[in-house]
Amino acid sequence: KLIHPKAKSGNATMALARTGTFPLPALPGRKPGRVMLIGIGPGKAEWRTPEASQMILGADELVGYDLYIDLLGAAAAHIPRRDFKLGEEEARCRYALESAATGKDVAVICSGDAGIYAMGALVYELLDRSQDAGGVSSAARRVTISTAPGISALQAAAARSGAILGHDFCAISLSDLLTPWAAIEKRIHAAGAGDFVVAFYNPVSRRRRTQLAAARDILMQYRGGDVPVLLASSLGRPEEELKFRTLGSLDIDEVDMLTTVMVGASSSRHLSLGRGEAVYTPRGYAKHLDRDNHAAVSYTHLRAHETLLY
């Protein structure tokens, strides 16, 4: 018996009825869909979290840039996929949300971490808009969103090269496709004034070759040209390459679209070790190390003096 007629809102449609039969007989329905934002790291399977792998295996559909899905290898072999090209980010996220609205568990595959310069923010931006304002359908706005974190390029680069992120750092994308260069320039000045280690994402593209040189010149106003710079390319892949440079010697022609550029702070140091090179940024333990060393030296001198007395 119908108690309250159907009513609609922006978030739900409902009606209320009373039944004399319990439990209810099987009724046709559709399970709620889910969008899974999955960061797969830079590309190496061993760097993918178990949670990300489980989400991929449980997905009804994989959505993403075709290269990123290809990086999954055998893990994606038997799962339906919808490939998108670079530049189709909005279409990618919109499709994932609307597909999930039909009851599917849709995995949006992102390199690195889905919430760092990836699709996570765009998915939420679409959910934050009404359909009339360019958002998604009301059904798509009701899907569940789950996120599996991934290793971002700055983390992978730091791990491969030592501990350049040992103290305060920031990340700045040099792509001015969506962000005005004036805003990016302002952030570089702020990073320089704050003496942050800086990880530059999207340093160059085929058409964009001037921003990294400009960023280098800005940072040299705040720190010397001798601070270490790391060029980390194709991290976690067979063609991985690390190059150790200084800010003053940074050559833009050594950088490509797959490179993350890490610029050290004024305190960052470069080491040449027997097993290779490394860069690190001290956390601030020097005064403790100096104090302990002074105490050890004083104790050694005292023991030597006592030995002479006896």
Segments and roles (model prediction):
Residues 1-37, 105-106, 193-298:
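A contiguous loop/helix-start segment that scaffolds small-molecule binding in enzyme catalytic cores
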Residues 15-26, 30-45, 50-145, 251, ...:
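Class I S-adenosyl-L-methionine
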Residues 40-47, 179-181, 243-244:
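Short gly/ser/thr-rich secondary-structure transition/capping motifs
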Residues 69-71, 89-90, 116, 152-155, ...:
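Short gly/pro/ser/thr-enriched loop/turn and capping motifs at secondary-structure boundaries
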Residues 118-194:
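Class I SAM-dependent methyltransferase SAM-binding "motif I" and its flanking Rossmann-like core
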Residues 299-307:
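Conserved small/polar residues in nucleotide/adenosyl-binding loops
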